[in-house]
């Protein structure tokens, strides 16, 4: 996974609104449920105070699509779920992926320790676990990519990629805002691929 695909800096001039939203969206994580999803707090993107913040996220999504030479004018960028993650010392995120979206992101607010690991099966591997015998880890023989988080760092990746955090000694909370994005076609109905705009959907 190329670093240019997953990492970018995004500075917020006024972080006070982000902290105010966190005060409203925080939850009790003492029982191990460290993500807002487990508490029904998944609509942070509806907080009007954070509209400028999410517009900046959208710009980063468009840049992400542009990196792959995707015709970005074809798609609407839909924020479908966003939540805070609160990790106390000794708490980590297990291996998981986001099954309900196309693109996922995490924005680090307070970040002591705990690297994020993106994991994907390497198509170069000739047989199961072949790359457990490597002498040196390189871009073409590995199946993981480690990102050391830092404040105001935005990480974006395909939702289908498994990821987790590795524990590191720390004394403070790690707080981040994560989200899921679904791409829908803007106007086109002449293609097999891609989701049609939601206005064409119907329930019976």
Predicted region positions:
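An acidic/histidine-cluster motif and surrounding catalytic segment
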Residues: 180
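Short, cationic low-complexity segments
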Residues: 29, 129, 197-204
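Single conserved hydrophobic/aromatic residue that forms the stacking wall/gate
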Residues: 1-7, 11-12
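Ligand-binding loop in jelly-roll beta-barrel domains
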Residues: 162, 166-176
């Amino acid at each position: 996974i190329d670093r240019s695909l997953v990492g970018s800096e995004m500075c917020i001039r006024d972080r006070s609104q982000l902290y105010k939203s966190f005060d409203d969206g925080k939850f009790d994580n003492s029982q191990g449920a460290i993500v807002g999803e487990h508490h029904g707090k998944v609509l942070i993107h509806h907080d009007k105070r954070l509209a400028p913040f999410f517009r900046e996220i959208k710009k980063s999504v468009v840049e992400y699509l542009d990196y792959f030479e995707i015709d970005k004018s074809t798609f609407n960028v839909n924020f479908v779920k966003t939540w805070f993650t609160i990790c106390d010392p000794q708490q980590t995120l297990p291996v998981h992926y986001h099954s309900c979206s196309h693109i996922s992101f995490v924005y680090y607010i307070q970040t002591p320790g705990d690297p994020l690991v993106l994991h994907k099966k390497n198509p170069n591997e000739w047989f199961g676990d072949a790359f457990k015998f490597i002498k040196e880890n390189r871009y073409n023989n590995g199946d993981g990519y480690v990102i050391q988080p830092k404040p105001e760092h935005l990480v974006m990746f395909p939702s289908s990629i498994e990821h987790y955090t590795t524990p590191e000694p720390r004394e403070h909370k790690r707080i981040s805002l994560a989200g899921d994005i679904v791409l829908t076609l803007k106007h086109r109905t002449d293609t097999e691929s891609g989701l049609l705009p939601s206005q064409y959907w119907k329930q019976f």
